[in-house]
Amino acid sequence: AWNGMAISSLVSAFRATRNPKYLEVAQEAANVLLLKLWLPDKLVHSDISTQEGFLDDYAYVEKALLDLYDVDKNPRWLEKARDFNALVLQRFLEQDSGKFLYAARAASSASSSSSGSTQALASAKTYATTDGTWPGAAGVAIENLIRLDALPKVARDGTTGPDYLAIARRSLAASGRAMQEDPVAHASMLVALERLLRVRTSFGQN
């Protein structure tokens, strides 16, 4: 998660100052991250472990890739963001409830103690809906869905993605009562909801 946050911060610095050095460092960091932490079928939590990352690792890196694509239009970032999103939906989205889990449903079966912790989190159905010292992973993941819906839909292999907005709406609805009862703890979810409402308003004006 920290790597994704750092890359997004560098992109924000570039937007504010137009200093190309910030963008260059962000691009380099993203390339290193994809080289070191991205395995063929998962994002690992660190470069010294094969433990799969948690939802915040995926969501924040996906956000960083979308932020990079917004400023440099490199299609590689968008393709990788789609790859990350596909795994988020496959491994972290609980189909029955529409909520996002903090640990992947198909947790690693490795016998390390860290892997056991991951499996315990998955079996306990720890949801990622509330904010802590940074925005909650579910809110970021939902906002990523809404952003992806506004971008080119056809992937490199000619396929189109899922109905991103429908998934976002369902996930927000699943936490609707919690957002009403404790909006401060669900600020990132409310930010995602506000973005979704802006999308619906713009459709209505077309």
What are the roles of these predicted feature ranges?
Residues 1-206:
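Glycan-recognition and catalytic cores of secretory/periplasmic carbohydrate-active enzymes
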